[in-house]
Amino acid sequence: MKKTQQKEIENVTNITGVRQIELWRRDDLQHPRLDEVAEEVPVALVYNGISHVVMMASPKDLEYFALGFSLSEGIIESPRDIFGMDVVPSCNGLEVQIELSSRRFMGLKERRRALAGRTGCGVCGVEQLNDIGKPVQPLPFTQTFDLNKLDDALRHLNDFQPVGQLTGCTHAAAWMLPSGELVGGHEDVGRHVALDKLLGRRSQEGESWQQGAVLVSSRASYEMVQKSAMCGVEILFAVSAATTLAVEVAERCNLTLVGFCKPGRATVYTHPQRLSN
């Protein structure tokens, strides 16, 4: 491949998280063609100079990811606990260098653990089995949601996946207003990372969690429920199914969990009192 062409591809990658590679189609194995593939890179979150976790993620909106992860894992209580943040290249991927308040950093050091993440990581940030499903502060019951508004949101969820439309390789997480309008959506090769990006962005912008719900394009794992509850989200809609542990955690923390969300269809696992038809 010519150097100029490679440089153009690298520039596209930097902007979109997409790279062009050569591949072969089943009906023509003799002639390669260029096609778009989603990028997946190791991203290290480094707090006050100490690497805390490495996750596989799309190289976009990493400041939102770092903020959302810090909130949903209980490392910080609010965006004010972070004094500064920089995304820098490292030898094998990217680092998000985070300047944490002294008080929160002391708490982090007490629970620090080494973790190598994966795209489908289901226990990210968990140190031992006893920590899985640890209850969070029970959520209040402050809102209701009309399920008739869900269908329109489902039709537009793909709008927040430009990389996914090119590659078929990303998950999306978006905030759904009571009207069914989707706002503030994010995508990533990792479903948990997409959710953290959404949580981080809305927290950074000071948006309320009391009027609306989270909609994700993936299944609902225990960690998706716990992350949502940690940030005050009362309702979580998932396009696919929920796991048993996700249902148990949602029940304990008063989160309304809904799966199998398709036009005209939804399965409510917990706390249906927030929903109406």
Swiss-Prot record:
Domain of life assignment = Bacteria
**Mainly resides where?**
cytoplasm
The record, for HAMAP family, names: FdhD (MF_00187)
- Write out the entry's keywords from A to Z: Cytoplasm, Molybdenum cofactor biosynthesis
Q: What's the source species' lineage?
A: Bacteria, Pseudomonadati, Pseudomonadota, Gammaproteobacteria, Enterobacterales
Q: Name one GO molecular function term.
A: sulfur carrier activity
Function, as annotated = Required for formate dehydrogenase (FDH) activity. Acts as a sulfur carrier protein that transfers sulfur from IscS to the molybdenum cofactor prior to its insertion into FDH.
Q: Where in the cell is it found?
A: Cytoplasm
Q: What is this protein called?
A: Sulfur carrier protein FdhD
Please verify whether the record's keywords include Cytoplasm: yes
Q: Which gene encodes it?
A: fdhD
Which sites are catalytic? C121 (cysteine persulfide intermediate)
The entry assigns this protein to a family as follows: Belongs to the FdhD family.
The keyword Glycoprotein appears for this protein: no
A Gene Ontology cellular component where this protein is annotated is:
cytoplasm
Single GO biological process annotation from the record: Mo-molybdopterin cofactor biosynthetic process
**Record: residues binding Mo-bis(molybdopterin guanine dinucleotide):** F260, C261, K262, P263, G264, R265
